[in-house]
Amino acid sequence: MCRLPGTTEPYGQAMLSAAEHERLLSVLPTAWHPALSHGRIERVRSGMSAASVFQVGASHFLKIAQGPDAHDLRGEIDRTAWLGHQGVRVAPAVKVHAAGDLVAVLSEALAGSSADETDLPAETVVPALARALSALHAIPVRDCPFDESVAVRLGRAGVLVESGLIDPGVFASRNRDVSPAALLERLRTRKPDEQVAVVHGDATLSNLIVGNDRSVAFIDCGHAGRADPYTDIALVIEGLAERFGSGAVDGFMHAYGGPALNERKRDYFLDLYELF
């Protein structure tokens, strides 16, 4: 996680103090200062990302990453831009800065609310998400330069498990008595047949922004790439079932189109996400 120069603590969890604001400006180009010198700047939840995330007024978000995490943010910027060029609704980058081991991006805020917090009813949200994911998964995969296959994800998971960075205490109840190493081995030996599509890669409801016009946008796109569609489908239907009840799963699959729900793949990709 990026830290303010001269401190050992992460950025403030609410509105930045004047001193924190000055330290934030000190790591960014002077050309950025006018955009960051007026209005409220708040630290916000960053989800799975190791980057520090700030809301700048009502119109922009700022992400900063330093050290090893900077590479991941650079990848997120590239993948988000690629999706945007394919016509996918994403948060447009206004400014990008990369110097030394620090990367920062200032992006436009998107109209709407995340699918886990929207006030829109299930009969609006469920088909909207299904249509958005179906369209994303229909992008020609040959044009996508980013590999997020099971092999790639298992390799990444192996590093995390070996480094002791996976907390089994947050595993779902079905894996409550399974160690990270045992779960990894199970995933390695029970790989499903993979289909390949362009996926978001971290499609929790918090990363899907639903507008009042029923449009859907994608944020936190650092794991977008070529992968099995169930990389996304499993997470979305799990979130919809928790938010709206099990009937939302049938509604999603009907609106998404294609074959009936593959429960084996759903379970596999939910388990793989435990090591994400």
PLM features: residue spans?
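Charged phosphate-binding loop/patch that engages nucleotide di/tri-phosphates or the phosphate backbone
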Residues: 19, 258-276
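An alpha-helical support segment within catalytic cores of ATP-dependent transferases
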Residues: 20-33, 135-201, 260-262
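ATP-binding pocket architecture of kinase catalytic cores
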Residues: 43-146
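Active-site Asp-x-Gly
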Residues: 70, 150, 193-198, 211-264
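Juxta-kinase regulatory segment immediately upstream of eukaryotic protein kinase catalytic domains
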Residues: 2-39
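Active-site acidic catalytic loop and adjacent metal/ATP-binding pocket
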Residues: 45-62, 182-231
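Short, structured helix-loop boundary elements
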Residues: 70, 123-126, 177, 181, ...
